[in-house]
């Protein structure tokens, strides 16, 4: 699993002896990994054993960064991360129960040479990667959200099924107006126009994505039915028969949830329906409690809990329907990773970025697999006097 632990590599790159404390703490963390049923030399190959102390100090941030820096490898990163996530807390507590162990851990963390004052320099940033990057590994409709895998086998089919499910849950009829908040590259909007005869307004704060929406709508002859705007949801005016927001509220911090639902209520017709799809957290928090994801993938992001969504919608909208598709996001992320693996050598991205993106997709897949993360779909109305029925 790892190289002999009597030698290490300092931050400067010069070889040197690892201290007694670091060796002891490193051995403890390695034992914790073994107790998570991670097979030495098979599930995980360690190239630099100095990372163990950093794992003890900075947790997931160090785990992700050490993978990015090639300090460890695995043929199945998703399985390694899933096993670590599934490890019972009691097992971890037993390893660190004695006062001597806790003292050694404290000393090792105090003198951790792997600590950084700032993030690794990944030149390519998540939302500045360009349309062609995402086009190379997403489905043909460029859906950057969870697909629906019931009865289907491919990513294209899963994303088509997801869009069909949204259309059915919205109970769309020809001529209805739809507001798509955070419309991405417009794939859902174009689908609702072609399949249901809807009139769609899509908003997005990304200029590049809006340009893509407009050009694609023109290319498909849908420009009269698809109106795309480069603006924030805060600037919305008007009313729509239906509102849809897929993978958008994750970028609205909890303190602004109330405002978001106030705006949705104002923009929704009295007899309208609103569909919301979001990644969800099991516990209410004000910020995304994951230092690696916050630093490298979703700065400023947050995952709402059911309680936070319900509280924000209270006295504004009525929750009519709820569904959890969490396990389907595991399948979606693994399909994305499979596609990404096929094209990564042609992307002309840095090695640090490639490994960051691989870890992002596989780490997130493990979270859904172990049910640490959820994928929720909500349907809301203003004041419908009929029972909502979806089959």
Predicted regions and their residues:
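Feature captures hydrophobic
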Residues: 1-160, 165
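Conserved class I S-adenosyl-L-methionine
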Residues: 175-182
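Conserved SAM-binding loop of SAM-dependent methyltransferases across substrates and taxa
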Residues: 185-196
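Conserved SAM-binding strand-loop segment of SAM-dependent methyltransferases
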Residues: 220-233
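A short acidic, Gly/Pro-enriched loop at the edge of an enzyme's catalytic core
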Residues: 234-243
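A short glycine-rich, Lys/Arg-flanked "PGG" loop and its adjoining helix->strand segment in the class I
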Residues: 258-270
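Conserved beta-strand signature within the Rossmann-like core of class I S-adenosyl-L-methionine
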Residues: 271-279
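Substrate-binding/catalytic lobe of Class I Rossmann-like enzymes that use SAM or dcSAM, i.e.
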Residues: 279-391
